[in-house]
Amino acid sequence: MQKLLQKITQGSLVKQIMVGLVAGIIVALVSPATASAVGLLGALFVGALKAVAPVLVLVLVMASIANHKHGQKTNIRPILFLYLLGTFAAALVAVVVSFMFPSNLALVAGNAEINPPGGIIEVLKGLLLSVVANPFQALISANYIGILAWAVGLGLALRHSSDTTKSLINDMSHAVTMVVRAVIRCAPLGIFGLVASTLAETGFGALWGYAQLLVVLIGCMLLVALVLNPLIVFWKIRRNPYPLVFACLRESGVTAFFTRSSAANIPVNMELCKKLNLNEDTYSVSIPLGATINMAGAAITITVLTLAAVHTLGIPVDVPTALLLSVVAAVCACGASGVAGGSLLLIPLACNMFGIPNDVAMQVVAVGFIIGVLQDSAETALNSSTDVLFTAAACQAEDQRLADEDPLKVR
């Protein structure tokens, strides 16, 4: 019994997740009622991840900054640049693919209760207000912009504290990390529950009517994940990027695909960064920051659905307007985490560029909700895995630079 438990707790998490995935599909096909019931396992897993993620971010960032040594480099600027570059490039890819394979929408009735933001200024205003949120409210509502602001502020203040205080913060950081590891070990059960309940309750029948749109959306995301991102990483590290790309997709992307939450996947990404032996001072800040602003998947969703509406309505689009749409989609995507409903509710902003009435834009949003089972999952997988990928690329590039300058220097 003890050997079995040891095998379960120390075995390959990826293999266990794949077993959970297959088991979930089988249960959903054999007994939909049972599959709906085991959905509780998925809900518990996602709930546990969402519960521990805000505390993890607060404590890790605070500990990292409080113990930061003067002159020690954190690489946040290069990572931030990669985040913004990746998001804009993803929107550009979506524009090109949408022109190559234009989609038509069978527009459905909009949801009257949906309230999208009124403009880009409103989105940016929401992000700025998130910075000055009450710290307890930020933790409760998982407002990661607010959590990061308070963690950075407290960390800077605690730099001047005694060694005992710094030691206490470090111990808290280790304690929270241990809790996170325990939660992540439950991933196979969580994935099993999520897959089984999703297939049993939703199914994929509703998706067939939007097959071409889904192919364009998922195709763009695969193109970004397997071609564009590797090119960016190669430019940064100057060696074969695919081992790193596949490691991030396998260990971060798979979990994010089923949890459908970048915030819930933060602990998974933190653990992967540790496994990749990255600088903790860097990833403890860049991963929660990425979960907030690194939104390549959201940029693709906004662009593809907007251009599908434009094509359906027969509105002509020139090259400068298409480029402007890429910029607008990238800016909107960076604000997607601050909007309830995420990328879908920012589609009316982009539609507004082409003079599309709000009621028609909301019908496009409704189409987005119909295909959300796959769209949201793929979008989150791309967003979250890219957080780790770009963090690792920046860290490895910096390590290589230091090694070239001083071959005897060991980080």
Curated annotation (Swiss-Prot):
The chain crosses the membrane at residues 17-37, 41-61, 79-99, 138-158, 189-209, 214-234, 295-315, 327-347. One of its GO terms (biological process) is threonine transport. NCBIfam families: PRK13628.1 (NF010151). Pfam families: SDF (PF00375). Belongs to the dicarboxylate/amino acid:cation symporter (DAACS) (TC 2.A.23) family. This is Serine/threonine transporter SstT. HAMAP family: Ser_Thr_transp_SstT (MF_01582). It is found in: Cell inner membrane. InterPro entries: Na-dicarboxylate_symporter, Na:dicarbo_symporter_sf, Ser_Thr_transp_SstT. It comes from Serratia proteamaculans (strain 568). The keyword tRNA processing does not apply. Its main location: membrane. GO terms for molecular function: neutral L-amino acid:sodium symporter activity. Involved in the import of serine and threonine into the cell, with the concomitant import of sodium (symport system). It comes from the Bacteria. It catalyses: L-serine(in) + Na(+)(in) = L-serine(out) + Na(+)(out); L-threonine(in) + Na(+)(in) = L-threonine(out) + Na(+)(out). GO terms for cellular component: plasma membrane. Keywords: Amino-acid transport, Cell inner membrane, Cell membrane, Membrane, Symport, Transmembrane, Transmembrane helix, Transport. PANTHER family: PROTON/GLUTAMATE-ASPARTATE SYMPORTER, SERINE_THREONINE TRANSPORTER SSTT. Gene3D superfamilies: Sodium:dicarboxylate symporter. The keyword Magnesium does not apply. It is a multi-pass membrane protein.
